[in-house]
C-alpha cells in the first residue's frame, strides 16, 4: 500500500503538469472503486487546477468550485500521459487537460478512491479527524507525549493510527522503531520523553529520506513517470524477518501486530 512518502512523491511528480491547467474532461471507465465515483466529480470539468496538495495519504486537487480527493488505496497509481496513450487494463479514470495530456488513474485492486468535495476539505468526513502531518512542526515530542499518555496499546499501533499521526504506515513504523531502538510491542504510554524525542526525529528522518529516494516499491508502486522508488534498498527490518540484523547480526524476529507483519531485533529493540 502506498504510504505517505509514495503519495508525496506522486504529488511532486504530477504537480508541474496540473498546476494552472484547465480540465477539459473527466472519463470514468469504472466507477466501482472503494466508494463509487460520484456524478458530482464531473464538476471539475471546465475548472482550472489552482493547487495540488497532500493530506495524510490523500491527494487534493483544488479548483474554485471544489476539491477532487484521490486515494491510491492498495495498488493505485497516477501517471501523466499524452491523451493518445492507449488505455490499459485497470486504467479506470482519465482527467483530461487543456495541454493535451491526461492524469490517468490505474488501480488493479480497486481499493482507491476518486471523490469530490465542495466543503472546506478539512470538514470532509475522511479528513476531519486526522492527526498532524509527521513532517510538519505540529508533530513534536510535546505533542506525541501528550497523545500517548496513559495508552496501553503497542507503540507501533499508535504510530499507525491516523488519529495520532498521519501517513506512517507499516513499512515506516517498522523502520522508525528499529532506528529508535524501541520494541514495537512496548506500551505507548510507558515510553519516556527521551526515547520519544528520538522516535519523533527518526520518523521525520526516515520519511524525508524515503521521499528523496522516490518512495518504496515492493510490488505495485510507481511514480508519475512510471518509475519505481528505491527506498526498499535501505530497509533495515521491514520484509526481512529471519534475516540478520544490519546493526548486530542477530536474527530478526517477525510477529503479527494488528494483523500486520512486524519485524524487529530483540537485541537492538529490547522490550
UniProtKB/Swiss-Prot annotation:
Q: Which InterPro entries match?
A: DNA_glyclase/AP_lyase_DNA-bd, DNA_glyclase_Znf_dom_DNA_BS, Formamido-pyr_DNA_Glyclase, FPG_cat, MutM-like_N-ter, Ribosomal_uS13-like_H2TH, Znf_DNA_glyclase/AP_lyase, Znf_FPG/IleRS
Which residues make up the binding site for DNA? Answer: 90, 109, 151
Protein name, please?
Answer: Formamidopyrimidine-DNA glycosylase
Co-factor(s): Zn(2+)
State the free-text cofactor note. Answer: Binds 1 zinc ion per subunit.
GO terms classed as biological process: base-excision repair
Which controlled-vocabulary keywords does the entry list? Answer: DNA damage, DNA repair, DNA-binding, Glycosidase, Hydrolase, Lyase, Metal-binding, Multifunctional enzyme, Zinc, Zinc-finger
The record's comment on protein family reads:
Belongs to the FPG family.
Instruction: Kindly give the SUPFAM superfamilies that the UniProt entry links to this protein.
Output: Glucocorticoid receptor-like (DNA-binding domain), N-terminal domain of MutM-like DNA repair proteins, S13-like H2TH domain
User: Which EC number(s) does UniProt give?
Assistant: 3.2.2.23, 4.2.99.18
Amino acid at each position: 500500500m502506498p504510504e505517505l512518502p509514495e503519495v508525496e512523491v506522486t504529488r511532486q511528480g504530477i504537480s508541474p503538469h496540473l498546476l494552472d491547467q484547465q480540465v477539459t474532461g473527466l472519463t470514468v471507465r469504472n466507477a466501482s472503486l472503494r466508494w463509487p465515483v460520484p456524478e458530482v466529480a464531473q464538476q471539475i470539468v471546465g475548472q482550472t487546477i489552482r493547487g495540488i496538495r497532500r493530506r495524510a495519504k490523500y491527494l487534493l486537487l483544488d479548483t474554485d468550485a471544489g476539491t477532487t480527493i484521490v486515494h491510491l488505496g492498495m495498488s493505485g497509481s497516477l501517471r501523466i500521459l499524452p491523451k493518445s496513450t492507449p488505455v490499459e487494463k485497470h486504467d479506470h479514470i482519465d482527467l483530461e487537460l487543456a495541454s493535451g495530456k491526461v492524469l490517468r488513474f490505474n488501480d488493479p485492486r480497486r481499493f482507491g478512491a476518486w471523490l469530490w468535495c465542495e466543503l472546506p476539505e478539512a470538514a470532509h468526513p475522511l479528513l476531519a479527524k486526522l492527526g498532524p502531518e509527521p513532517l510538519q512542526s505540529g508533530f513534536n515530542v510535546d505533542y506525541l507525549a501528550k497523545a500517548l499518555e496513559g495508552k496501553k496499546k503497542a507503540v507501533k499501533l499508535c504510530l499507525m493510527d491516523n488519529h495520532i499521526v498521519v501517513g506512517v504506515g507499516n513499512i515506516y513504523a517498522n523502520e522508525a522503531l528499529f532506528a529508535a531502538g524501541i520494541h514495537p510491542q512496548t506500551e505507548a504510554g510507558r515510553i519516556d520523553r527521551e526515547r520519544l524525542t528520538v522516535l519523533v526525529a527518526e520518523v521525520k528522518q526516515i520519511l524525508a529520506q524515503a521521499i528523496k529516494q522516490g518512495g518504496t516499491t515492493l510490488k505495485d508502486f510507481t511514480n508519475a513517470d512510471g518509475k519505481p522508488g528505491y527506498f526498499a534498498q535501505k530497509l533495515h527490518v521491514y520484509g526481512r524477518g529471519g534475516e540478520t540484523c544490519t546493526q548486530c547480526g542477530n536474527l530478526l524476529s517477525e510477529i503479527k501486530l494488528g494483523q500486520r507483519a512486524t519485524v524487529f531485533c530483540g537485541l537492538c529493540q529490547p522490550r
